[in-house]
Amino acid sequence: IFMLNINVDPKKELGAVKPLHGINNGPISLAGVHNTEKEYAEMGIPFVRLHDTDYPYPQAVDVYQIFRDFSADPNDPKNYDFCLTDQYIAAIIRTGASVIYRLGTSIEHMEKKRFIAPPGDYDKFAAVCCGIVRHYNEGFADGYHYGIRCWEIWNEPESDLMWSGTTEQYFLLYETVSKALKKEFGDTISVGGYASCGFYGIEKKEEERTVFQKKFIAYLSEFIDFVKKTDSPFEFYSFHYYGIGV
């Protein structure tokens, strides 16, 4: 059993506590049936990350839901369908929360996987990602000027439910997309990832780690080495923690 003890000295001032009550996905759910904007605002949710939106049947946010024909021109506004994603993000903005936008796709538990394979054209995929950022931050395709800061490249590529390619293929995707985003948008955005499954067992000695635990630690180490070697933009690291006993 994992236990954490927190000791508080009320006589010592350390400054403001960073907000820790961000949440995954916005107030609109079940294809618009429920809207909890009021509750989000009352709770003061500081940021909302977009992943597995309207799971298990996503219609918005995912790159392949917005840009459905990858033979089309990513520079042409008419090839994007932002309608549902616009509504979804507008509801988040109205609550006062900031958006963390995951560029990629949702998890696929079914036997047939549709969107988790490496893109056929990495440069075109990066161009589409730029189009999405441009829409929400620079008004492209009748868009907005939200100033969304954090753009996360994919989610859990260590998992075969999220990425059917190799480790090297994901690393190349990260390099391609991150460099394209920073080239166009510079310091107006931050790019990172890779929304890791976690790094379980990192507190243990090497010989005490399970094969499962070693996998995630090795992936992180290899990723850090890769972004250093390729000078890929890497401005934040995101990860998940799935609880005790892993």
PLM region spans:
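Aromatic- and kink-enriched transmembrane "portal" helix at the membrane-lumen/periplasm boundary
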Residues: P157-D160
